[in-house]
Amino acid sequence: MELSPLQPVNENMLLNKKKNEDGKKRLSVERIYQKKTQLEHILLRPDTYIGSVELVTQQMWVYDEDVGINYREVTFVPGLYKIFDEILVNAADNKQRDPKMSCIRVTMMRNNLISIWNNGKGIPVVEHKVEKMYVPALIFGQLLTSSNYDDDEKKVTGGRNGYGAKLCNIFSTKFTVETASREYKKMFKQTWMDNMGRAGDMELKPFSGEDYTCITFQPDLSKFKMQSLDKDIVALMVRRAYDIAGSTKDVKVFLNGNRLPVKGFRSYVDMYLKDKVDETGNALKVVHEQVNPRWEVCLTMSEKGFQQISFVNSIATSKGGRHVDYVADQIVSKLVDVVKKKNKGGVAVKADQVKNHMWIFGNAVIENPTFDSQTKENMTLQAKSFGSTCQLSEKFIKAAIGCGIVESILNWVKFKAQIQLNKKCSAVKHNRIKGIPKLDDANDAGSRNSAECTLILTEGDSAKTLAVSGLGVVGRDKYGVFPLRGKILNVREASHKQIMENAEINNIIKIVGLQYKKNYEDEDSLKTLRYGKIMIMTDQDQDGSHIKGLLINFIHHNWPSLLRHRFLEEFITPIVKVSKNKQEIAFYSLPEFEEWKSTNPNHKKWKVKYYKGLGTSTSKEAKEYFANMKRHRIQFKYSGPEDDAAISLAFSKKQVDDRKEWLTNFMEDRRQRKLLGLPEDYLYGQTTMYLTYNDFINKELILFSNSDNERSIPSMVDGLKPGQRKVLFTCFKRNDKREVKVAQLAGSVAEMSSYHHGEMSLMMTIINLAQNFVGSNNLNLLQPIGQFGTRLHGGKDSASPRYIFTMLSPLARLLFPSKDDHTLRFLYDDNQRVEPEWYIPIIPMVLINGAEGIGTGWSCKIPNFDVREVVNNIRRLLDGEEPLPMLPSYKNYKGTIEELASNQYVINGEVAILNSTTIEITELPIRTWTQTYKEQVLEPMLNGTEKTPPLITDYREYHTDTTVKFVIKMTEEKLAEAERVGLHKVFKLQTSLTCNSMVLFDHVGCLKKYDTVLDILRDFFELRLKYYGLRKEWLLGMLGAESSKLNNQARFILEKIDGKIVIENKPKKELIKVLIQRGYDSDPVKAWKEAQQKVPEEEENEENEESESESTSPAAESGPTFNYLLDMPLWYLTKEKKDELCKQRDEKEQELNTLKKKTPSDLWKEDLAAFVEELEVVEAKEKQDEQVGLPGKGVKAKGKKAQISEVLPSPVGKRVIPQVTMEMRAEAEKKIRRKIKSENVEGTPAEDGAEPGLRQRLEKRQKREPGTRAKKQTTLPFKPIKKAQKQNPWSDSESDMSSNESNFDVPPREKEPRIAATKAKFTADLDSDDDFSGLDEKDEDEDFFPLDDTPPKTKMPPKNTKKALKPQKSSTSVDLESDGKDSVPASPGASAADVPAETEPSKPSSKQTVGVKRTITKGQSLTSTAGTKKRAVPKETKSDSALNAHVSKKPAPAKAKNSRKRMPSSSDSSDSEFEKAISKGATSKKLKGEERDFHVDLDDTVAPRAKSGRARKPIKYLEESDDDLF
């Protein structure tokens, strides 16, 4: 029989019954399908309405008399709890209807009667006209009645569905309502019995007192399977009474006649936290805020996951809901940010994990709340419908961050990190380890003899091979070998993620069997390790010392107890070996070798071999080392807390300032030793057997830290780092007349100057020295012949070193005269003479090309300055005048740079408004690269982001590799708004530059911090002047010797001709006697050189030729030398040769007399004049080279002009003047104060001095609280720039990069020559906060970026320029033509001033050119151009007048006048040229003045750059590449 789908399940069951049941009476359809009244349904299925009516056991918050509110396990019936709550909430709801209500009384009687009374407005005692019954009887005795059904009315009560009080009535054996209404002057009372099944008689009485309502009910406990109200349910009900007291404002709650001691929500929260403490035993901190009348929030820390106690309109939402999420999410979002900052690199923390540490108390009043059930434990209304908002204040958030939650999260993070780290360790000792490549495990490792095993950690695979060779002697049972891939991580400052992912560290832990957090104090714990010792085997150089230090730091940081067990030792190998016959001596430190040399006069007879690394040793030597293990194994010995302090000093991030003093004392100590002639301190003598950690740090590791500074921070004298100096040394030595490939030159540098690092970094150094685009070098020392990078990508677009060529710039030898080489102190490496300690240029190159580098303890940042201004200031100093202030300046930069405060500058790009919907950007801040700007600024503005809508509608690009031009379209409204805010701010065209870290090595090799650029200039001036004196002294000696030599030779020839001397057929000895008798001098030149005790470089190679015979024969050395006379050829006796010799003698004498009359200042001025003259020639050549590549060479002039005008600023644009606000200046001042404060703590390196001994001062210092000075790199607003910062290129190698930009010299729009100082008025608003603050902090590394951009000068003084420029007169005309800097190295001087010339068409007369000349552009003190004079008074030059005319026309110009900023280098001259070109073309409708301003003789001036950046692997030009290694 088939069943119909409607048949009930129980009938299906009947079908399966046996046949004998068929006879039984079947159930009728009526009994199967029933209809119940709603009252019956509620009683039959109570869980639908009030929740379960069965006993439930769970954890709940209750109130116990003896304990107070506590969280414990209770057994209760949810339905009973719910009906009580409904009445209680109704009483609280009355407060919303009647704000005057002030009291609720809850009474629980022994006979299970419960009474709840409130003095709010009574229920209307009036008959309902529709239902024909009194309202109290209607709402308490009839189902589905309520005052809450109008959803259009915004109610903030707990009632909603019309069930609440009726359900209490239905589940009570007796339910009495008593209410009095003053309004209706009646009192109503009625009782229902038998589950609302029977209503008693209604009582009505007249009433004139205060309103009140009292509900008394006796729960039908049989429905709840109970006999009486037990302790647990009463504890729950009492807690609800406390809830109401805490959540209902201004209402006194009485329980059984006693007032509850709760005075508001805050005191209610305290009841939960009574006796609760945090991990440290302190009472929990509570953060409280009454956000507004409808929201009140408290927050504290939770140790049991997320907890919340919340109320919505007095309903206890025990399961929370959207109101809790709404508040919690606000707090979590803020805390997550804080935790991420404090937990950089640790375990990733998610929002839910942060939430798990919070305990929120919330009391909310919400309009028409919705819940997921009648039990109302979870509020589901969306936040947008709350009817109010809860915006937590900053004060609350700040307090929340400090209340212990963040600390709790961080502790949890550490715990979690520890668990993850422990997974990397094995608690069990294994005999065999799998999965670690290159490990040669000791045979006994992990066995019972493991304590006797030693793990040898080597520096690289080659050192491992050496160790394995040595193991042939000592065997492999007790020795394992594992090669390190370089320097291991500094775990003290590493993030959790770094440690987790660092294979090297995890491998060491696995190999040795270490376990995190385990204390290896006793012998038993040591037996759990696979190896009893670690032996460190690295090269005996400074990088090898650093690896040793990092390993010591790794063990000390994680397992300090191991250091006390002599767990670490090192294996040392010789640095030098000397041998003679079969005798051999090994030295383990260079000072020891030098000491041996000084005590052994015959040391030259010994053969010397230098060992650069472990790879230099042969297998035979390795076996010798291991055979004499006692000599080569040095144990590290723990000597006490001073060892711990020393290790922390070297590696802790918090002890930056201590490290500074540590290094300063070391440098001072070393200087004192040199002055006193004492040998350097060294560690490894012939008898050294062990070493304390303190000695290792203070005598060996400090050498690495010091060399790190030497490699990263340039010298004040020549502005070069060692890598750059080696390149220059090699170039001088090669003296190439033809270009050479960069890759080949790098090989030559490595060979000639003992360069010990990677050739790739060397090639990058060479490229950086040759770069000349805007923002790189102002004066490139090498020529960029090929693609060396452009401003499009910041130099990263340079071609492969195999494809590009370079050679010395013609200016290099004028800057570093060869005459000075004899006064320099050359260094020796492996007994090979290499580069000098420093070169001594004729101008301070560190100011010309800037400097940037980060070493140990210090960082250096110096911007570029204008060559001519520097030359001019040196001339002023030579004349006894004070130098003029200088602003940073970058060659060919067309923006402006202004001073905000001392050593704080703002760099402005150029933007102009073309019409109501179009603007044009023609210059970006320094080191904001064109491509980067496009991707990071314009693209997001065009496409919008998740958070910001699009700002612009389109943009077009018209730039070349040297110029910038973006034409941007936007709506009128957006442009107007951007103008109001400030175009420079909106388009990120302002960056800041801070120069508060001008730290350089002085001439004695000590670090010195300079407060101002002029301090550097004065220091350089004093030293250079002294060296001109030394040069003169050397030249006088040399010329005197040469004059004497020629004099002797001439006399000898004359006397021979006259027959006074006969040399034919006479013994040599007799000849020598005759020469002595006749008063001839022994070779004067040779004698003078020997007196100098050194041979000049150029003659180093001639030793073997000229003087080989003399120097090799002992007789020659001991007696006088007359070979210079006797070796003269016979044809010197001819009349011509005799006359020539006499002429040479007279000329040399004249030269000597002339030199004697000159002062060192005269010599310097001569060098400066020659340099400036050549500078003009070089710049002229650059411009000429640029013009060669002009587009449309064979095209008509008009077409050519059209092409060029495309890349030049539009003549119709209205320049927007950058605005420097008071806020920006105030912020700059604040930063300076902050910086000064932190730097005072550090102390100036050079001055810290070393009064007490190094060690004592160090120990004192170690206790000092760590300083706060952290180094940040400045970053432009765009991400890419940050990369730039990495490299310190600015510091030396790249400083020269600016030539590319000058291709088209576009006059800055409406700019006037800089005249007076800082009062520049700017129309545009600047984003001081954004752009500035970030950038300044970068200070130490990136400040530079901004620096570069700033040609505009706010500082004054044109006067001086005149003097400096005199020599340049001729150059002006040349300049005009030579704007192009394509293949020629950028000329140093071009910076700002030189550029202007570019714009000059060939037509302009030389006069005009002079006026226009760089003089004007460059800024205050152009030094070498005749045009300078004019610069001082702008009116004099055509370009100036044109500018003025233009200015007068436009409103903005006037403002521009005040801001005498540094103008783009080509602005002045270019202005005049442009004007001409425009007026001639008559293409523009503008006034003449305007036309001139923008016109250029396109034909001559602008040549689109031939170079185009070539895509290739990015080159980090920013920092000196050598530094990358370290």
Curated annotation (Swiss-Prot):
Keywords on record: Acetylation, ATP-binding, Biological rhythms, Cytoplasm, DNA-binding, Isomerase, Isopeptide bond, Magnesium, Metal-binding, Nucleotide-binding, Nucleus, Phosphoprotein, Topoisomerase, Ubl conjugation
User: What top-tier enzyme class does this entry carry?
Assistant: isomerase
* Sites of Phosphoserine modification: 4, 1210, 1291, 1293, 1295, 1298, 1328, 1333, 1370, 1373, 1383, 1387, 1465, 1467, 1470, 1472, 1521
**Residues holding Mg(2+) 1:** E459, D539
Pfam families, per database record: DNA_gyraseB (PF00204), DNA_topoisoIV (PF00521), DTHCT (PF08070), HATPase_c (PF02518), Toprim (PF01751), TOPRIM_C (PF16898)
* Intracellular or extracellular location(s): Cytoplasm; Nucleus, Nucleoplasm; Nucleus; Nucleus, Nucleolus
> Which residues does this entry assign to the site Important for DNA bending?
I854
Locate the residues binding Mg(2+) 2: D539, D541
Residues annotated as region Interaction with DNA? 340-342, 988-997
- Cofactor(s) essential for the protein: Mg(2+); Mn(2+); Ca(2+)
Question: Which Gene Ontology terms describe the biological processes this protein takes part in?
Answer: apoptotic chromosome condensation; cerebellar granule cell differentiation; cerebellar Purkinje cell differentiation; chromatin organization; chromosome condensation; chromosome segregation; DNA damage response; DNA topological change
Ranges for region Interaction with PLSCR1: 1429-1435
InterPro entries (UniProt xref): DNA_Topoisomerase_II, DTHCT, HATPase_C_sf, Ribosomal_Su5_D2-typ_SF, Ribsml_uS5_D2-typ_fold_subgr, Topo_IIA, Topo_IIA-like_dom_sf, Topo_IIA_A/C_ab
Instruction: Cite the post-translational modification comment.
Output: Phosphorylation has no effect on catalytic activity.
Q: Please report the stretch or stretches of sequence annotated as the Toprim domain.
A: 453-570
Q: Which Gene3D superfamilies match?
A: 3.30.1360.40, 3.30.1490.30, 3.30.230.10, 3.40.50.670, Histidine kinase-like ATPase, C-terminal domain, Topoisomerase II, domain 5, Topoisomerase, domain 3
Covalent link Glycyl lysine isopeptide (Lys-Gly) (interchain with G-Cter in SUMO1), residues: K1237
Q: Which residues form the active site?
A: Y803 (o-(5'-phospho-dna)-tyrosine intermediate)
Ranges of Polar residues composition bias in the record? 1417-1427
Site note Interaction with DNA, residues: K487, N490, R659, K660, K721, Y755, S761, W929
Q: How does it assemble?
A: Homodimer. Interacts with COPS5. Interacts with RECQL5; this stimulates DNA decatenation. Interacts with SETMAR; stimulates the topoisomerase activity. Interacts with DHX9; this interaction occurs in a E2 enzyme UBE2I- and RNA-dependent manner, negatively regulates DHX9-mediated double-stranded DNA and RNA duplex helicase activity and stimulates TOP2A-mediated supercoiled DNA relaxation activity. Interacts with HNRNPU (via C-terminus); this interaction protects the topoisomerase TOP2A from degradation and positively regulates the relaxation of supercoiled DNA in a RNA-dependent manner.
Function summary: Key decatenating enzyme that alters DNA topology by binding to two double-stranded DNA molecules, generating a double-stranded break in one of the strands, passing the intact strand through the broken strand, and religating the broken strand. May play a role in regulating the period length of BMAL1 transcriptional oscillation.
Q: What is this protein called?
A: DNA topoisomerase 2-alpha
